[in-house]
Amino acid sequence: MTTLRIATRKSPLALWQSEHVADALRQHHPGLEVVLVPMSTRGDEVLDRSLAAIGGKGLFLKELELAMLRGEADCAVHSLKDVPMELDEPFVLPAILERGDPADALVSNLYASLQALPLGARVGTSSLRRQAQLRAARPDLELIDLRGNVNTRLAKLDNGGYDAIVLACAGLQRLGLEARISARLDAPEWLPAPAQGAVAVECRGDDARIHSLLAVLDAGRTRVCVEAERAMNRALHGSCHVPVAAFARWEGQDLFLQGMVGSASDGRLIHADAHGSADDTEALGRRVAQGLFDKGAAQLLAEL
């Protein structure tokens, strides 16, 4: 019997996503034994500083990639929004699964919407993208850093540290916590992180056997959308240091891509969008990025 080892972070959401991939692989390959290799990453361990301050979301990947290089794991499962725009050699993404809910969620025990929050309410999020959009919608809010896994963040809310917090809908839904969603924060008014809601599987590009096993999970229509979003982010040189948002959707045979760059300090937002061919997501991403630059995104980004 062939065995495939999946490196994964230890958080409940990461384990859910990895088990979801494992179940799909078992269905496609009935003779395949799939085991999880849970690991802790620096991004999980350092919770008293923002991701931007300690090196970015790539910290969630490095230990898992090292495990693959050492031969301790065959692949790794990630939230695609945490994956850097450029992968280090020799890594590739042979599978991007069908996208979950891309929206953000406002979670509060007392208030049913962003508009219902009282003047000066305390809202928890460490995402610069979320902070920028919150400041644009409600300049009066007090925004407070919030790190940790989904359950940790909810516990901090429940302990009274915040009036509300902002999380990804997909994470709450995958953990059976959809009832905690007070209000959805949806496109086009509120844009998600590039590739939010999508799960990706990473492996070594020189491992043809593993690549072949994983490729059957790839959802082509999802891949096209998230590649356009990531192409825009790449053209902007975006990272977790930068408040960048993007969302692509199918319109007939073409894609419609919306992009945003914002300021977490004062809530200035710059938007651009474009239609384009699904056959050239790179060009579509660059076109929306150029639209943002034409409206002053370079100056805004230079201030960060």
Curated annotation (Swiss-Prot):
Main enzyme class: transferase
Signal peptide: none
A GO cellular component entry from the record: cytoplasm
CDD domains: PBP2_EcHMBS_like
Cofactor(s) required for function per UniProt: dipyrromethane
GO molecular function, one term: hydroxymethylbilane synthase activity
Keyword Transferase: yes
Keyword annotations: Porphyrin biosynthesis, Transferase
Coiled coil: none
Note: The porphobilinogen subunits are added to the dipyrromethane group.
Subunit-level organization: Monomer.
Family of this protein: Belongs to the HMBS family.
Function: Tetrapolymerization of the monopyrrole PBG into the hydroxymethylbilane pre-uroporphyrinogen in several discrete steps.
UniProt-recorded name of the protein: Porphobilinogen deaminase
